[in-house]
Amino acid sequence: MHINWKKTIIIALDLVLGTYLVFAFTRFNKPDETKLLCTKVNINIQDEMTNGFLNAKEIKKRLEVRKLYPLGEPLKEVNARMIEETLKTSPFVKTAECSKTQDGLVDIYLTQRMPIVRIKSISNEDYYIDDHNQIMPNTNYTCDIIIATGYINKWYAKIYISLLSKALMTNELWRNQIEQIHVLPDRGIELVPRVGNHIIYIGNLPETNLIDKREQAINDFVNKKMNRLEKFYKYGLSQA
């Protein structure tokens, strides 16, 4: 078989030239990261406008204290991983992601732990419980959530009061009407409404060691008690 070496060499040279042109185009059109500065920082916080404790100003301040705020810095020196790890040390941050773009932007995305109840026990403990039933420290920020007072230790707060708060917050009427949970020495539960000069006693929460059944038992208990109370509000008070 006769090989046309001239044609083969031309094709090979074309391939080499094409590869070089592609490389040169991408190489020389890529911004020099050593000279590119961070021109803008976007801080995005999920649910920032609800009951969370995080805001962009606080995040900026935290990074500035650690000398990690990237605005005006060479993009090559911006350590996205270090920014993420620093923000994750906050007890109010659930997840943190940081990324850089070739046009000088640094994007920071955060999700936050959401408080569902504030605990102010008779032993002067003051902390929050989040939506995963875990303790959050007290903070200078305030938010409009239920306060639980009285004879509450941390175990009872995490295991039972958190579930009671969730059950109340799932109903729009009780989320707006109930402002305080009070636990008596025998663990009887009193609810304090925003409107009206009265106390609502609902008794003791059902207790069980079975985690998968505990939440359902408390939901059923609360729904039964509060449905009766709602009927009293609608019919009993209207006839008084």
Regions found by a protein language model. Give the residues of each.
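Charged, solvent-exposed interaction patches on well-folded alpha/beta domains
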Residues: 1-45, 52, 58, 64-89, ...
